[in-house]
Amino acid sequence: MPTPAPPTELLPWERAVVLLSCVLSALGSGLLVATHALWPDLRSRARRLLLFLSLADLLSAASYFYGVLQDFAGTSWDCVLQGALSTFANTSSFFWTVAIALYLYLNIVRATRGPCTDHLVWAFHLISWGVPLAITVAAVCLKKIGYDASDVSVGWCWINLEAEDRVLWMLLTGKLWEMLAYILLPLLYLLVRKHINRAHQALSEYRPIWEGRQLQRGSPTSMADKKLILIPFIFICLRVWSTVRFVLTLCGSPVVQAPVLVVLHGIGNTFQGGANCIMFVLCTRAVRTRLFSLCCCYPRPPTQNPPGASIPPKMGESQESRRTPEVPST
């Protein structure tokens, strides 16, 4: 890796934009947690996994906010603490994002049910919290976390650029898992989407009348189908700028300090919670309707299904039904 360039200066407007992104992400993650607490009947297994992703994103947004606000000029105790928290939360967010995709694949395509599902969720907890924690503790103990001149961050602390094996630790504390997610997320969601499309085609051969009604009204599964494409697409669009700056830093390119790249990197790393909120709250009719009713103080009408709509699953059964496999966003 070439000798690090002079520190990237974080302009006031850049800092303001990234701080706003942190706040919106924290609010979005908090809203996801609140909807989970308010409405027990929406607590499918997939949305419970989404809850843990939201907690990781909330911690990530808070730690990034402090780092951007401080705009560290060197390694200090709070720089190391902030770097450790953001490293743990960010890496955990990668693991939970992939865990949700893997869960949907196994549940919908492989029809995994019963005790196997419970064991799978426990495995997700062990890996998605345990691996990031172990990596972060090792990085702190070996004094790898510190000031990074904002070349691979946007004001916050991450891996100390003075460390000789900094590239290895950058990979271990985020970039390796980030690049794996670029591959796994599109692959898993495309497999799920392909399976659902095949199921719909087979069903339409035996239920042409039902299918016609769905086409007239707009099939509830069509929104889930779109989100199966949007979930990995949004993840990549947010995270790719971080990867671009990482590669530019490895090459010693001065382009790494370009204001546009800096801002895109800052938003991409901090807005994951906000993006999840848009996808799984604001773009989810069942949650959005209840939320608007609550905010506007309107009494929520008794659950009523329009003609042709599927019956809402009972508590805990959203992911268990084989007829209408649910994305945690439908």
From Swiss-Prot:
Q: Where are the transmembrane segments?
A: 16-36, 49-69, 88-108, 120-140, 167-187, 228-250, 260-282
- GO cellular-component term (any): plasma membrane
Which keywords has UniProt assigned to this entry?
Cell membrane, Cell projection, Developmental protein, Differentiation, G-protein coupled receptor, Membrane, Receptor, Transducer, Transmembrane, Transmembrane helix
Q: Name one GO biological process term.
A: circadian behavior
The Basic and acidic residues compositionally biased stretches are 317-330
> How is the protein disposed in the membrane?
Multi-pass membrane protein
Extracellular side: which ranges? 1-15, 70-87, 141-166, 251-259
Q: Spell out which residues lie on the membrane's Cytoplasmic side.
A: 37-48, 109-119, 188-227, 283-330
The subcellular location is: Cell projection, Cilium membrane
Where are the annotated segments for Disordered?
303-330
Molecular function terms from GO: G protein-coupled receptor activity
Q: Which domain of life is it from?
A: Eukaryota
UniProt record similarity statement: Belongs to the G-protein coupled receptor 2 family.
Biological function:
Orphan receptor that promotes neuronal differentiation of radial glial progenitors (RGPs). The activity of this receptor is mediated by a G(q)-protein that activates a phosphatidylinositol-calcium second messenger.
Listed name of the protein: G-protein coupled receptor 157
Species for this entry: Rattus norvegicus (Rat)
